[in-house]
Amino acid sequence: MKKQADSVRRANKTNSPQLQLITPFLWFDKEAEEAAKFYCSIFPKSKITQITRYGEAGPGPLGSVMTVEFVLNGLQFVALNAGPTYKFTEAISFVVNVRTQKELDYYWSKLSARGEKVACGWLKDKYGLSWQITPIVLMEMLAGRDANKTNRAMKAMMEMVKLDIKKLQAAYNGRS
């Protein structure tokens, strides 16, 4: 197993300083560039790194955007324009881990704009991609050893759409 991991590490050494082993690959109808710009406008340390276009042999119109490679806060993504064959589902989501209510409110507002607010901190953005805006403290509460506190936090979360850190903490501490 170690030999295989070392082999993968060697294979990933290219001119790219930080080639990641696993990259989320997102299938869009024809909104890949628009979506990448949208996501890059929301997250810090984000940018589009490369755009490729369809050539004569590709299934898309000649010269139209095929893929957009972009980075969101250090995580590399690829977005593909490939037609309406596949749609995003809630079976896959991206978790945004936040420390404060201000951060939670910011990401919730930006990502849910023209999208759908679902439940328990989940939302779908305007492209149908699912996100969870999750306070780090909630994960700590749910992993706690006191079953009563954990159950109170879970119950409070299940009744929320956008999460409220103060209300979650109050429930966890038995002050709701």
Q: What is each stretch, according to the model?
A:
Residues Q20, M66, E90:
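Residues that flank catalytic or metal-binding motifs in active/ligand-binding sites
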Residues E34, T89, K102:
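Residues that form or flank phosphate/diphosphate-binding pockets in enzymes
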Residues P59-G60, T85-K87:
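Short glycine/serine/proline-enriched coil/turn segments at secondary-structure junctions
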